[in-house]
């Protein structure tokens, strides 16, 4: 439909004095209809602004009607559109005396429209922001623009840096001009905004007192109202054009947030404005503004009377450089700024409708909608606030942990999950497992869709969920829920699309190791009375782990099997979980050391016939190479290279002149090495105590068992469950 509106705007642009009135009327009727139906893009609006401000074939009343009823954006607006409007505001100067003068009533209508759609414009860079805020203040000096430029000036002022002495001078001079009817009220509101940003300032206070705007006028200016009919049409167009970015409730709440910045101006003043200059005046409530507190001692002394300013947006921002207008007595308040979020939550009694809560929710929504230039500064603040209140964390999780926000911004969602989930506990057990299973399943489907098989989002989020479960299992009320959800996470982590990419995606390995470590710690507890079904992992999962080529994962599995030993001894051998665990131990000892894979009934649930057929079809360098040599710690994928490295370290430690050069350690290569170097070994020796392959494997295991070795639990497993190796256990040494 953009093409239809392009044609309509082009037709209007090409119209001139010779265009038949009926043709122009028909084109305008189409503009009225189609703009309300589909909305206008930023380039289309820019073309219309230029047309309305420069054409003479459309009367002023019609131009104003078009701005008020047809300027309905279908998405975000550009700074080019903003510059187009600015270029047509004001009156001709000595430098632009021949510029076409835009009618003042049309200029006012354009500024009014900007106020209604301000939330759709991008966040400026710091330099652009400084220039833009200066331009708006200069335009504010035109009396016919003051009413609608005042909100723009207020919204543009967001940091103490925006408060400049020259701005105060301009505002005060205009406010005192007798011909400017709206200036006193507008100027006072802007000054109150500045005061919110810089705190107590004698220069700002004196200006407000000098202007002396009466309460009734100030209240009427502060009570800004927008066109509800226009906004209802705008919300419908935005939500239909971009449902993910512009849900109707999000748009309305964003607008309300901007309006509240104006409605609440002055509400945090310590003294009524007219009595500000009277030194003998004592306020009835004896409140002390948080802005005036500069030390912990002051904070403690004034706690009952402490008043929280309404400018949450500034209070939650990272510390900024002090402004030149700040008096020395409050220059150090930034040192307390890290406490502001805590103070706000405590003073608001954790009221979910309070402004800090709403600020956190809407700032996060703006982050997901890419409306914030520096989300890396905002998100840590929100995480810090939510970490102190579980209810706020619950609201954030319920609102943002879903596929909708994942699609909007994966990185932001990962930051939110990483910061909030590990410390969060559910208030209600019912529905929590289902919520997270649905959430993680949706992330899995999204992460493994076509072309995204190596996406880390799923496994990284799993890791954060498991950190959360680690916290849950310390709570007796949540342990059953936590362990049930843990097994759900393990099932997802061992799905082929994730597990097969574990080597390139370490988050999946970290997540699964975390899940096993949780079960390991619970199994070690002497007073553990958790049902055994929560502690034993099913064969579909464990068999994949055992056959993994990841030594860290294999070591974690061995650590888990050793930890569950004492727990399982409390149950009869006929118990299905005991039999399941015994099968794990039998398979893993055969695989790692006993070398009875091909003679056993099965290995990890797979028939030995399968392995025989594979091994018989492998290319072997020597004809007498036996199939059995492919197994044990020195031959399996997870440990073969590690064993080579350990052997080289053993040779270096004993300063051997002869080096084992084969890339494979097994009985055949070892015997061949001894046969070739028999005389040299007899003369110079090799590794002390190593005379056969069994001795070498024991030496390697002893080296593995070192407490500093990340794979030490593999050795501990074999020392625990193999009688022939039990004498090498650390406990028996």
Swiss-Prot record:
Keyword line: Acetylation, Cell cycle, Cell division, Centromere, Chromosome, Kinetochore, Meiosis, Mitosis, Nucleus
Name of this protein: Inner kinetochore subunit CTF3
- Quaternary structure note: Component of the heterotrimeric kinetochore subcomplex CTF3, which consists of CTF3, MCM16 and MCM22. The CTF3 subcomplex is part of a larger constitutive centromere-associated network (CCAN) (also known as central kinetochore CTF19 complex in yeast), which is composed of at least AME1, CHL4, CNN1, CTF3, CTF19, IML3, MCM16, MCM21, MCM22, MHF1, MHF2, MIF2, NKP1, NKP2, OKP1 and WIP1. Interacts with CTF19. Interacts with CHL4.
Q: TM spans, by residue?
A: none
What is the protein's species of origin?
Answer: Saccharomyces cerevisiae (strain ATCC 204508 / S288c) (Baker's yeast)
Main localization of the protein?
nucleus
The record's similarity note reads: Belongs to the CENP-I/CTF3 family.
PTM N-acetylserine: list the residues.
Answer: 2
Which biological process annotations from GO are given for this protein? attachment of spindle microtubules to kinetochore; cell division; chromosome segregation; DNA replication initiation; establishment of mitotic sister chromatid cohesion; meiotic cell cycle; mitotic spindle assembly checkpoint signaling
Annotated GO CC locations: kinetochore; nucleus
Function field:
Component of the central kinetochore, which mediates the attachment of the centromere to the mitotic spindle by forming essential interactions between the microtubule-associated outer kinetochore proteins and the centromere-associated inner kinetochore proteins. Required for establishing bipolar spindle-microtubule attachments and proper chromosome segregation. Component of the kinetochore, a multiprotein complex that assembles on centromeric DNA and attaches chromosomes to spindle microtubules, mediating chromosome segregation and sister chromatid segregation during meiosis and mitosis. Component of the inner kinetochore constitutive centromere-associated network (CCAN), which serves as a structural platform for outer kinetochore assembly.
Q: Does the keyword Acetylation apply?
A: yes
């Amino acid at each position: 439909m953009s093409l239809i509106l392009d044609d309509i705007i082009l037709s209007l642009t090409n119209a001139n004095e010779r265009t038949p009135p009926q043709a122009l009327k028909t084109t305008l009727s189409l503009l009225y209809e189609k703009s309300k139906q589909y909305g206008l893009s930023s380039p289309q609006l820019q073309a219309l602004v230029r047309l309305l401000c420069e054409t003479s074939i459309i009367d002023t009343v019609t131009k104003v009607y078009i701005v008020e009823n047809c300027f309905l954006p279908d998405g975000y607006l550009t700074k080019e559109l903003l510059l187009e409007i600015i270029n047509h505001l004001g009156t001709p100067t000595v430098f632009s005396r021949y510029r076409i003068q835009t009618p003042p009533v049309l200029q006012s209508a354009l500024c009014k429209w900007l106020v209604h759609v301000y939330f759709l414009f991008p966040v400026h860079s710091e330099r652009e922001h400084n220039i833009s805020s200066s331009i708006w203040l200069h335009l504010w000096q035109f009396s016919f623009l003051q009413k609608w430029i005042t909100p723009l000036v207020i919204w543009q002022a967001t940091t103490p840096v925006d408060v400049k002495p020259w701005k105060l001078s301009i505002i005060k001079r205009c406010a005192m001009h007798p011909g400017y009817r709206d200036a006193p009220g507008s100027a006072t509101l802007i000054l109150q905004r500045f005061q919110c940003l810089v705190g107590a300032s004698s220069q700002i206070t004196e200006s407000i007192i000098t202007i002396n705007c009466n309460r009734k006028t100030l209240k009427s200016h502060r009570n800004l109202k927008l066109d509800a009919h226009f906004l209802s049409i705008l919300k419908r167009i935005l939500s239909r054009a971009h449902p993910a970015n512009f849900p109707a409730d999000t748009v309305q709440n964003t607008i309300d947030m901007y309006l509240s910045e104006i409605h609440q101006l002055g509400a945090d003043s310590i003294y009524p404005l007219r009595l500000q200059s009277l030194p003998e005046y004592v306020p009835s409530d004896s409140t002390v503004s948080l802005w005036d507190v500069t030390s912990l001692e002051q904070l403690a002394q004034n706690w009952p009377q402490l008043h929280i300013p309404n400018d949450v947006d500034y209070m939650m921002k990272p510390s900024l450089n002090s402004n030149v207008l700040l008096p020395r007595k409050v220059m150090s308040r930034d040192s307390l700024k890290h406490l502001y979020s805590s103070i706000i939550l405590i003073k608001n009694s954790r009221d979910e409708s309070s402004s800090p809560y709403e600020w956190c929710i809407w700032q996060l929504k703006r982050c997901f909608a890419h409306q914030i230039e520096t989300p890396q500064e905002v998100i840590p603040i929100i995480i810090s606030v939510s970490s102190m209140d579980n209810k706020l964390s619950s609201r954030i999780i319920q609102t943002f942990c879903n596929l909708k926000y994942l699609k909007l911004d994966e990185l932001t969602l990962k930051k939110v999950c990483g910061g909030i989930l590990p410390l969060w506990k559910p208030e209600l057990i019912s529905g929590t497992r289902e919520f997270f299973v649905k959430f993680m399943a949706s992330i899995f489907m999204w992460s493994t869709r076509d072309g995204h098989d190596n996406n880390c989002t799923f496994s990284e989020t799993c890791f954060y969920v498991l950190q959360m479960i680690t916290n849950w299992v310390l709570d007796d009320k949540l342990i059953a829920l936590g362990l049930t959800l843990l097994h759900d996470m393990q099932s997802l982590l061992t799905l082929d699309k994730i597990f097969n990419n574990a080597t390139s995606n370490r988050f999946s390995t970290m997540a699964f190791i975390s899940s096993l470590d949780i079960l390991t710690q619970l199994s070690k507890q002497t007073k553990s009375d958790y049902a055994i079904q929560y502690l034993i992992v099913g064969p579909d999962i464990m068999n994949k782990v055992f056959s993994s080529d990841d030594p860290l994962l294999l070591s974690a599995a061995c650590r888990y099997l050793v930890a569950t030993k004492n727990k399982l001894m409390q149950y009869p051998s006929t118990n299905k979980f005991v039999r399941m665990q015994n099968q794990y131990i039998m398979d893993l000892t055969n695989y790692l050391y006993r070398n009875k894979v091909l003679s056993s009934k099965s290995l990890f649930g797979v028939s030995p016939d399968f392995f025989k057929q594979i091994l018989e079809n492998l290319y072997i360098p020597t004809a007498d190479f036996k199939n059995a040599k492919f197994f044990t710690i020195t031959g399996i994928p997870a440990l073969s290279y590690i064993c080579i490295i350990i052997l080289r370290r053993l040779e270096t430690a004993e300063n051997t002149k002869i080096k084992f050069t084969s890339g494979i350690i097994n009985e055949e290569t070892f015997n061949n090495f001894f046969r070739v170097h028999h005389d040299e070994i007899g003369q110079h020796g090799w590794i002390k105590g190593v005379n056969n392959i069994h001795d070498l494997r024991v030496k390697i295991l002893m080296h593995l068992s070192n407490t500093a070795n990340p794979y030490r639990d593999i050795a501990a497993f074999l020392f625990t469950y193999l009688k022939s190796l039990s004498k090498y256990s650390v406990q028996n040494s």
